[in-house]
Amino acid sequence: WCRLHDIWYLKIDLEIPDVCISEAQAVYDEGFFVPHRYGDGDGWESASLHGFVPETAENTDMGWHYTKNPSGHGLTEETVKWGWTEVQEVAPETKRWLEEFPHNKYRRCRFMLLRPGGEITAHHDQHGKRHIQHASPGRPYGGTIAAAINLAFYQPDNCYLRRADTKEELPFQNCTGFWFDNGVIHEAHNASDENRFHFIIHGGSNRERKDLMKRSLAKQFGNDVLKEID
């Protein structure tokens, strides 16, 4: 339904605690953030709260600096193990929120930093996916809003994430979350003098989360939409 109506984001009907802001700052103060995806932006950094390490590692504590998919670090799905990283020590309430959020098995769950003046160049995140017929120029892979969850812990003024084709901005405010079709060509810029702290969740979908998505769809677009998707 969302793809048919070119809906590329959906606000999650769930509260995010304010403490996530201070915990994101603590992750920054402790020096956990590392540069993320060289070439796609400037001032873009990340730290994994839940992630992976090589299977030979004693535990998953050091998984915080593996912020890309396993292949991006020269690893494979078969040679890594997943779990909470030592970032949990400075972000216990964020971890608790994630444990209570509807999920099955998480993959990467990462704090994301965009520094003052930082920018993320126009890109999409559906690499290796087939270009679909009759797709719009700004949505060449006809993705799904369930592709990723983007939580805005702290969103300064003069800061945006937007579609590259229409310049439509995601309506982030502090402690709001959105399902987000990352197959849309999008870009971001932080024109403020403050750090932007977001959090991205991959994996873990289950029936309870699908019910949450239906509830969120009804809240944003009205109950009639449920008749179209059921």
PLM regions with names:
Residues W1-K105, R110:
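Non-heme Fe(II)/2-oxoglutarate
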Residues L151, Q155-D230:
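Catalytic core of Fe(II)/2-oxoglutarate
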Residues L10, E15, V19-S22, A135, ...:
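Compositionally biased, intrinsically disordered low-complexity segments
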Residues R37-Y38, L49-E55, L114, Y154, ...:
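Structured loops at beta-to-helix junctions and adjacent beta-edge loops in soluble globular domains
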